[in-house]
Curated annotation (Swiss-Prot):
Gene: yqfB
Protein name as annotated: Membrane protein YqfB
Highest classification ranks of the organism: Bacteria, Bacillati, Bacillota, Bacilli, Bacillales
InterPro entries assigned to the protein according to its UniProt record, in alphabetical order: YqfB (IPR016788)
Source taxon at top rank: Bacteria
Region (Disordered) location: 25-87
Any one Gene Ontology cellular component term annotated for this protein: plasma membrane
Record's keyword terms, sorted: Cell membrane, Coiled coil, Membrane, Transmembrane, Transmembrane helix
Length: 139
């Protein structure tokens, strides 16, 4: 029993189980309170709907004009966003082209330096093993 209480994994598991149990209860209470609040909002909104139905016939042309304005505004915003995206895409393409050109730039000095370093370091040990290892492999 003492070993169980000193093991941190078991203690963490017990704490997790307890918190899960209490967490479920609090979630259920929140859901119940939200369900109770919703019907109250529906009742208070119904008189407003009745009033708006009486006023509704007059502003129909205004609604259409407003909808048209909103659609036009969304179209303009979409066009602005599209132009911005096109600029970003063009900049990204130019950047990739620039990096490719930069990677492919090879001048005489870098080629000579690469050849010299290749000769200095020589072939890898796997291709040219040490002398002491050759007899051991043959056996």
């Amino acid at each position: 029993m003492e070993d169980l209480l000193t093991n941190p994994l078991i203690i963490a598991a017990i704490i997790g189980i307890i918190s899960a149990i209490f967490g479920k209860k609090s979630k259920e209470e929140k859901q119940n309170s939200q369900k109770r609040k919703k019907p109250q909002h529906v009742q208070s909104a119904s008189p407003q709907k009745k009033q708006s139905k009486e006023d509704a016939p007059a502003p129909i042309p205004n609604r259409m004009e407003q909808a048209r304005r909103e659609a036009e505004e969304r179209r303009r915003e979409t066009a602005r966003n599209l132009k911005g995206l096109e600029r970003d895409l063009a900049a990204a393409k130019q950047k990739t082209v620039y990096t490719k050109q930069k990677m492919l730039q090879v001048n005489k000095d870098t080629v000579v330096q690469g050849i010299v370093l290749g000769e200095v370091f020589g072939p890898p040990r796997a291709k040219k093993p040490h002398r002491t290892m050759r007899p051991a492999r043959k056996n």
